[in-house]
Regions:
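SH3/SH3-like beta-barrel fold
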Residues: 6-8, 25-31, 38
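Extracellular carbohydrate-recognition regions
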Residues: 8-11, 35-81, 85, 92-101, ...
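Glycine-centered tight beta-turn/hairpin loop motif at sheet-sheet or coil-to-beta transitions
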Residues: 9-11, 31-33, 128, 190
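Secretory/extracellular carbohydrate-interaction modules
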Residues: 83-152
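Beta-strand-rich interaction surfaces with strong enrichment in secreted/lumenal proteins
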Residues: 88-94, 157-164, 211
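Carbohydrate-binding surfaces in secreted/extracellular proteins
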Residues: 102-104, 164-198
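Short, aromatic/His-centered strand-loop micro-motif at the edge of beta-sheets
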Residues: 148-171
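Flexible glycan-contacting loops in extracellular carbohydrate-active proteins
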Residues: 193-211
Length: 211
């Protein structure tokens, strides 16, 4: 299992194991090469991963394992990318249990709206009866809602994303601390918003969906 997360100034990143660090180079191993070295000058950050860290999913490589909603033509897979061509739900059970980091690249044309329920059990439909947290992402802002069966919906706050008004592709990263009931959103490695659910972590599912 990897123990460090290494980021480089050119945007590349790798998970691996640290072998050594001297005044000029960082030495590490990865699953695809026994040992690699890189000059320290190209290194942006090196972070040690928490104990028990594991990679649940890397992809996509196909539609296998993904659940589609009522309109199976709303989503399709092509060349390593999931493409939305209509209004529909796409979900997958990732076996989320503890804290997590969810990362994906998002590209769009024109105006768009994307809802990302996390820690949800509703994978093929949009369901307000499923205990989850829902990120509402559009050009320029993001909002987070807590959805809890029997308690309704509560808006936890909104963050501004001005760079999404001038771009059509960004890297999205969601960091979720289940124990502290805290959630963070990063766009292109920059913190957009941090939320905390004062009532504790309410979501009970283990999947993620896109709508």
């Amino acid at each position: 299992e990897p123990t460090v997360h290494i980021r480089f100034h050119n945007g590349d990143e790798v998970l691996g194991n640290l072998i050594g660090l001297d005044t000029q180079n960082v030495h590490f191993s990865t699953w695809f090469n026994e040992q690699l070295s890189a000059p320290r000058g190209v290194l942006q950050s090196l972070a040690f991963l928490s104990p028990g860290f594991r990679i649940l999913y890397e992809g996509p490589t196909s539609m296998n394992g993904w659940q589609l909603g009522r309109d199976p033509k709303a989503w399709k897979y092509r060349d390593g990318v999931l493409i939305s061509e209509g209004v529909g739900v796409l979900g997958r059970n990732f076996d989320l249990q503890g804290s997590s980091r969810i990362e994906f690249d998002l590209q769009w044309n024109g105006t768009f709206s994307l809802i990302v329920p996390v820690y949800t059990s509703s994978l093929d439909r949009f369901d307000y009866r499923s205990n989850s947290y829902m990120f509402y992402i559009s050009r320029g802002y993001v909002s987070l809602q807590r959805v809890q069966s029997g308690a309704g919906v509560r808006n936890l706050g909104q963050g501004q994303i001005p760079k999404m008004q001038t771009k059509n592709r960004v890297n999205v990263e969601l960091r979720i601390n289940k124990e502290k009931a805290e959630m963070e959103m990063y766009i292109d490695r920059e913190l957009v918003k941090k939320w905390r659910d004062a009532n504790g972590f309410a979501a009970t599912g283990s999947g993620i969906s896109f709508f």
